[in-house]
């Protein structure tokens, strides 16, 4: 069993145990109607968009620096981030829906609920907590599940980042005709990362979609290496959480898009 299989099994058990029903009862409704969409920001700029992530740990990291997360989110916005990603998995990533709820109130930026979605109730909880965007990982869903969850999320006026890791998954994603596709440079089965993976996967990408390179971006050189693939944005977590001066680091990542 891979780490990804283990995480997905854990999510299914949480569903059976009523974890998400309880969250729907205890979370307060958050109004985010004033927030702009992430897609509108992708539409309006010739620079790479940055989804800046809040994370505490992962299966490959014991612990990240202990930050004032409310301030971190404000610093992300002040230094040019276009959206914020917040991990809500408690067991493997040290996040929570309560954290998402607290932090979405600290920013005018749209917030991505970063989790392993396998059921509509998880989308309900993300929406109630104040997410503007949800993540669907192609690898853990059948085509029918993906279609059902995508349509359900968009019916709730949520944006969807559809995540792929290989060319086969990219072709499956295209069937949905999603607006935004993320290419994860991290193999979620083995949790190994290669930042140039984006270039390989998008060699023959189709037009009419926005593409986000996710994971493994450490510096401006990494961005320069992947921007040639024709991406529209980046999702960055660990490097930003470790950074001691976001005002120097984050704006430098927003290179001009390369049209292919």
UniProtKB/Swiss-Prot annotation:
EC numbers listed for it are 4.1.1.48
Task: Note the superkingdom of the native organism.
Answer: Bacteria
Can you tell me where the transmembrane regions are? none
Q: Which UniProt keywords apply?
A: Amino-acid biosynthesis, Aromatic amino acid biosynthesis, Decarboxylase, Lyase, Tryptophan biosynthesis
Pathway of action:
Amino-acid biosynthesis; L-tryptophan biosynthesis; L-tryptophan from chorismate: step 4/5
Q: Which InterPro entries match?
A: Aldolase_TIM, Indole-3-glycerol_P_synth, Indole-3-glycerol_P_synth_dom, Indole-3-GlycerolPSynthase_CS, RibuloseP-bd_barrel
Record's catalysed reaction(s): 1-(2-carboxyphenylamino)-1-deoxy-D-ribulose 5-phosphate + H(+) = (1S,2R)-1-C-(indol-3-yl)glycerol 3-phosphate + CO2 + H2O
Which GO biological process categories is it annotated with? L-tryptophan biosynthetic process
Query: What Pfam families does UniProt report for this protein, alphabetically?
Result: IGPS (PF00218)
User: Which family does the UniProt entry place this protein in?
Assistant: Belongs to the TrpC family.
UniProt name for this protein: Indole-3-glycerol phosphate synthase
